[in-house]
From Swiss-Prot:
Pathway: Cell wall biogenesis; peptidoglycan biosynthesis. InterPro entries: Mur-like_cat_sf, Mur_ligase_C, Mur_ligase_C_dom_sf, Mur_ligase_cen, Mur_ligase_N, MurCDEF_pg_biosynth, UDP-N-AcMur_Ala_ligase_MurC. One of its GO terms (biological process) is cell wall organization. This is UDP-N-acetylmuramate--L-alanine ligase. One of its GO terms (cellular component) is cytoplasm. The gene is murC.
Length: 468
């Protein structure tokens, strides 16, 4: 039995979230009656409202009065008034991943998982399949610039989704094709141990059907080890590793883009295909790897080399993934979602390879628990930044942890040899700190998953006003 086509209103609690908004948008496009609420009036809420979806700002019990079904994200607490009301009314309450899984049953599906790179890789897979006239439905964890949204309804047989592993619910997703970009210690508050995380990814791959396949990055040692523990499923490996089935070769990172070639070697004797002079208009070795994963899927699904080449060259990127917000005095300013040490290091490495000037990092640490559990990694992931400006921790609802804060991170950076790590007391002080350091050709990179994105977009104007 599949999700009935005729349901009463489906109410999303937290509809403005990046994952929830995409599901809501696709369901509305499928003809379901969709509504929802969010604590804040954000861009996603406004976009859904403009598309005819009824939205409420603020959570109130009366918002679910006419609902037949309620969808919740993991961010919604048990004491939410709408959730309490839904349960008092005995309404079905569905987790976000469960509803995504229901949508996936309508299509053949590619699910993109991994600690880092999911959103960009999902966007790249969607772009390449679109170029191959497969017209996929897409539900992503970020705004795809070419679409202006994180979701689109396609008429083709394929769906491409970002598989969020943070609460383990990605194991509910019925994928035909699975991508694993990397596996690092993250979300330990849910999983309890790194071994539990690795086991979850193994089960994610085991879930694909015998006629499907997994695309896995063997440059990452944990993923390479996982490949050795997968039985009875088809695996396509990718990476710079000489043993990879889809091998990334000769990366040239200059001028804010990546040039490379890819060699595809099937396990069939004698099969070999080389794609020369590929161009991706994004900097960074990590993005070239993401493109290689997408290329592996597209090639397997029959997309031509010419379509792949043109789609990569025309890729418009993803919002909050090394997004240029403006410039001042010849220095470029960027916004990036990176908030894990591995992500931060990759972004700063990409920035370093793209400019002859200095790299100035502005970071807003996200969650006390993350800073605590990965403290040593945070203290060493800024090596490619000439200056690190550290803001107070964005708590995301957490209580402070003694000895884990902005100042302890600055002390840790300096203790490990960083030459210029400074504190940001207030967002209003950022322009002054940057203006005293930024010169022509420098990159100012704002990093974090909290409110720092607002600072990144405001900074060019604030610098201009300061100069005046």
């Amino acid at each position: 039995m599949k999700l009935p086509e005729k349901l009463g209103p489906i109410h999303f609690i937290g509809i403005g979230g990046i994952g929830m908004s995409g599901i809501a948008e696709v369901m509305a496009n499928l003809g379901y009656t969709v509504q929802g609420s969010d604590a804040n009036d954000n861009a996603n809420v406004r976009r859904l409202s403009e598309n005819g979806i009824r939205t409420f700002v603020g959570h109130r019990a009366e918002n679910v009065e006419n609902a037949a079904l309620v969808v919740v994200s993991t961010a919604i607490r048990r004491d939410n008034p709408e959730l309490i009301e839904a349960r008092e009314r005995r309404l079905p309450v569905v987790r976000r991943a469960e509803m995504l899984a229901e949508l996936m049953r309508f299509k053949s599906c590619v699910a993109v998982a991994g600690t880092h790179g999911k959103t960009t890789t999902t966007s790249l897979v969607a772009t390449l399949l679109d170029a191959g006239n497969l017209d996929p439905t897409v539900i992503n964890g970020g705004i795809i610039n070419a679409y202006g949204t994180n979701a689109r309804m396609g008429a083709g047989d394929w769906m491409v989704v970002e598989a969020d592993e943070s609460d383990g619910t990605f194991l509910k997703l019925p994928a035909d094709v699975a991508i694993v970009t990397n596996i690092d210690p993250e979300h330990l508050d849910h999983f309890g141990s790194f071994d539990a995380i690795k086991d979850a990814f193994r089960r994610f791959i085991d879930n694909i059907p015998f006629y499907g396949f997994a695309v896995m990055c063997i440059d990452h040692p944990i993923v390479q080890d996982l490949v050795g523990h997968i039985e009875d499923r088809r695996i396509i490996t990718y990476g710079e590793n000489p043993q990879a089935d889809v091998r990334l070769i000769d990366i040239d990172l200059k001028g804010g883009q990546s040039r490379f070639r890819v060699m595809i070697r099937d396990r069939r004797p004698g099969f070999r295909l080389e794609m020369q002079d590929l161009v991706l208009p994004m900097p960074g070795r990590h993005n070239a790897l993401n493109a290689t994963a997408a290329l592996a899927v597209a090639h397997e699904l029959g997309v031509s080399e010419d379509a792949i080449r043109k789609a990569l060259a025309g890729f418009g990127g993803v919002k909050r993934r090394f997004t240029r917000t403006g410039e001042w005095n010849g220095a470029a300013i960027f916004d990036d979602y990176g908030h894990h040490p591995v992500e931060i290091a990759a972004v700063l490495r990409a920035a370093r390879s793209s400019t002859d000037g200095k790299v100035i990092a502005v970071v807003q640490p996200h969650r006390y628990t993350r800073l605590q559990s990965l403290f040593e990694d945070f203290c060493t992931c800024f090596n490619d930044a000439d200056t690190v400006i550290v803001a107070p921790v964005y708590a995301a609802g957490e209580a402070p942890i003694e000895g884990i804060d902005r100042d302890s991170l600055i002390a840790g950076l300096k203790a490990r040899g960083h030459r210029d790590a400074v504190a940001l007391e207030r967002p209003e002080d950022l322009a002054r700190l940057v203006s005293g350091r930024a010169e022509p050709n420098d990159y100012v990179v704002c990093l974090g998953a909290g409110t720092i994105t607002q600072w990144a977009y405001a900074l060019p104007g604030e610098l201009a006003a300061l100069k005046g």
